[in-house]
C-alpha cells in the first residue's frame, strides 16, 4: 500500500533471511531518497517565494509611484507614459505565467524595465549597457534571477558614488558554458564585504544581500553543482558578478515582455 515504514518479519540467517535484509535496506533507501526529494522541493518552493518577494520591494513600488505622480504634476507626460509602461511590464513579468523558468531574452527584458525605471529616478547618475549574444537568447534560467544582481550593483555601487556610474550586463557562450556578467564602475567592495555577500547569516539583515544569496541558492537548485557564481571587486574601481552556467535551451513562447 505504499508504506515505506514496513519491514519484513523474517529473522533467519538463511538465504531467505538475507533476501529479507536486502528488502529492508531497499525500502529504507527508497524512503530516504523520497524524504530527500521532499526536502529539496520544499527548499525550492521557499527559495522561489523569497525570490518573488525580493523582486519588487514595497519601497521601490512606492518610490516609483511617487515619481510618476511628481512627473505628472510637472507636466512631463511623455516620461509618465514611459515609466508607467516600464512598471507595467515589470509587474507582468514578475507575476508571469506560472512557469519557474525564463529564457535569457525574457530575463533581460525584465531587467531592462527595471533599469528604465531606476534610470528615470536617478536621472544622469545611472547609465546602463546591455550586450546580449544572440546565441544565448534561448538559454533557460530560473525566473527573475538577474534583477537582484542589478539591484545590488545600483544600491551598493552606483548610488553611493557621487558622480554615479554605469551598470553593464553581458552574455556570451564559452565552450559548453553560458557566461553572464553584471558589472558596475561604482565604489567597489572590500575583501571583507565580498566574503559576506554570499553568507546567509549576513544576508538576513539586508534585502539586497538576501536577493544575492537567494540567486546563488536557486542556481544550485536548478543547475546543481555545475552552476558557479563569483564576485570580483576592486575598491573604488568596480564590482563584477559572473555566472558560469550549463547551457539549457528553451523556446521563446511569446514576446509580451518586450512589446
Please annotate each region the language model reported:
Residues 253-259:
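Intrinsically disordered, low-complexity acidic/proline-/asparagine-rich linker or regulatory tail/stalk regions
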Residues 26, 248-252:
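Short, charged/polar, Gly/Pro-enriched secondary-structure boundary elements
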Residues 1-56, 60-232, 238-244:
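Two-component histidine phosphotransfer core
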Amino acid at each position: 500500500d505504499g508504506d515505506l515504514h514496513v519491514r519484513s518479519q523474517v529473522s533467519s540467517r538463511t538465504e531467505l533471511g538475507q533476501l529479507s535484509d536486502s528488502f529492508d535496506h531497499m525500502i529504507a533507501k527508497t524512503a530516504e531518497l523520497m524524504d530527500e526529494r521532499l526536502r529539496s522541493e520544499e527548499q525550492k518552493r521557499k527559495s522561489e517565494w523569497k525570490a518573488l518577494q525580493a523582486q519588487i520591494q514595497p519601497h521601490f513600488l512606492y518610490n516609483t509611484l511617487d515619481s510618476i505622480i511628481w512627473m505628472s504634476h510637472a507636466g512631463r507626460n511623455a516620461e509618465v507614459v514611459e515609466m508607467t509602461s516600464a512598471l507595467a511590464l515589470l509587474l507582468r513579468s514578475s507575476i508571469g505565467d506560472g512557469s519557474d523558468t525564463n529564457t535569457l531574452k525574457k530575463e533581460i527584458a525584465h531587467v531592462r524595465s527595471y533599469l528604465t525605471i531606476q534610470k528615470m529616478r536617478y536621472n544622469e547618475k545611472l547609465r546602463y549597457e546591455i550586450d546580449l549574444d544572440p546565441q544565448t537568447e534561448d538559454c533557460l534560467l530560473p525566473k527573475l534571477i538577474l534583477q537582484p544582481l542589478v539591484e545590488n550593483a545600483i544600491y551598493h555601487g552606483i548610488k553611493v558614488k557621487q558622480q554615479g556610474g554605469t551598470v553593464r550586463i553581458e552574455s556570451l557562450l564559452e565552450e559548453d558554458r553560458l557566461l553572464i556578467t553584471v558589472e558596475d564602475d561604482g565604489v567597489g567592495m572590500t575583501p571583507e564585504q565580498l566574503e559576506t555577500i554570499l553568507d546567509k547569516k549576513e544576508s538576513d539583515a539586508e534585502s539586497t544581500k538576501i536577493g544575492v544569496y537567494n540567486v546563488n541558492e536557486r542556481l544550485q537548485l536548478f543547475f546543481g553543482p555545475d552552476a558557479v557564481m563569483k564576485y570580483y571587486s576592486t575598491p573604488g574601481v568596480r564590482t563584477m558578478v559572473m555566472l558560469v552556467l550549463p547551457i539549457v535551451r528553451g523556446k521563446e513562447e511569446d514576446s509580451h515582455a518586450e512589446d
